[in-house]
């Protein structure tokens, strides 16, 4: 048990979006060691098919299993929407997604709920289903925002065009007089300064990163897996260019992370993917 307690928590996303979850882990679980993986060679996930996402997630989880993680947080709403329920039973460590914690937080704040997310997450209706399962009276409006992740990954957050895009995506939600807005993609917290210029202060902003980490903390405590000594330095790995990831991420981490490039194992049975494609799509 001692060795498992010392194992890292795995966190993955398509890119820098999951750093919002990582920073929250630093805040709520400062004594835990972390392993962060960004699938930058294949981002953005939001325009991928369900079968592609499932394949990518399985490859990442197999690799993380090889790194002896004790828990994995899918710091990616698209993965959480399209793959979490399928892969949870395939691995012997807990896997947490961001959608259910975000939905629970949203229904505590209001009943007219807007969700901004990737197109794939919006198409899945994962947030609407989760929110209305908790509160059937809640009204939910979803907008798939195809341009946000590429703009963030290109470090164009302060580009005037990004604000124009934000107006385009948020206007339909504001027209519905929403009282709550959910960041349905972990990348979007990086755009908070822009959103706060557009969204009235009466609208509650929900960042699921805060709540999935709280859930992870509770689960570690229940399983007796909390680490109570100083952690190892966070390990960063990517499937794409390490230097690009490090350069972009340092503005949110406060330091230039040493990042390694890794090759993920191919683990997919093509016939199984075809079968699950019918389920996911």
Curated annotation (Swiss-Prot):
Keywords: Cell shape, Cell wall biogenesis/degradation, Isomerase, Peptidoglycan synthesis. Coiled coil: none annotated. One of its GO terms (molecular function) is glutamate racemase activity. It catalyses: L-glutamate = D-glutamate. Its EC number is 5.1.1.3. SUPFAM superfamilies: Aspartate/glutamate racemase (SSF53681). It comes from the Bacteria. The active site is at residues 76, 185. One of its GO terms (biological process) is cell wall organization. Pathway: Cell wall biogenesis; peptidoglycan biosynthesis. Substrate binds at residues 13-14, 45-46, 77-78, 186-187. It holds the Pfam family Asp_Glu_race. Belongs to the aspartate/glutamate racemases family. Provides the (R)-glutamate required for cell wall biosynthesis. This is Glutamate racemase. It comes from Rippkaea orientalis (strain PCC 8801 / RF-1) (Cyanothece sp. (strain PCC 8801)).
């Amino acid at each position: 048990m001692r060795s498992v307690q010392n194992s890292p928590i795995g966190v993955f996303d398509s890119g820098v979006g999951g750093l919002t979850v990582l920073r929250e882990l630093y805040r709520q679980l400062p004594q835990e060691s972390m392993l962060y993986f960004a699938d930058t060679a294949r981002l953005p996930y939001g325009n991928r098919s369900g079968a592609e996402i499932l394949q990518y997630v399985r490859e990442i989880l197999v690799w993380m299993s090889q790194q002896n993680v004790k828990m994995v947080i899918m710091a990616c709403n698209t993965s959480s929407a399209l793959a979490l329920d399928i892969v949870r039973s395939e691995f012997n460590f807990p896997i947490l997604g961001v959608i259910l914690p975000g939905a629970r937080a949203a229904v505590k704040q209001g009943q007219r709920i807007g969700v901004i997310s990737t197109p794939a997450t919006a198409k899945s209706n994962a947030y609407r289903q989760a929110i209305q399962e908790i509160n059937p009276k809640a009204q939910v409006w979803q907008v798939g925002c195809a341009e946000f992740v590429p703009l963030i990954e290109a470090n164009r957050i302060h580009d005037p065009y990004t604000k124009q895009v934000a107006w385009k995506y948020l206007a339909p939600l504001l027209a519905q007089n929403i009282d709550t807005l959910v960041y349905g993609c972990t990348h979007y917290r990086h755009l908070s300064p822009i959103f706060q210029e557009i969204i009235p202060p009466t609208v509650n902003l929900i960042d699921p990163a805060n709540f999935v980490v709280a859930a992870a903390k509770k689960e570690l405590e229940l399983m007796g897996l909390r680490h109570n000594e100083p952690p190892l330095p966070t390990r960063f790995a990517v499937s794409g260019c390490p230097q690009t990831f490090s350069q972009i991420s340092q503005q949110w981490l406060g330091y230039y992370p040493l990042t390694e490039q890794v090759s993920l194992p191919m683990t997919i049975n093509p016939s199984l993917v075809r079968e699950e494609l019918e389920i996911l799509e």
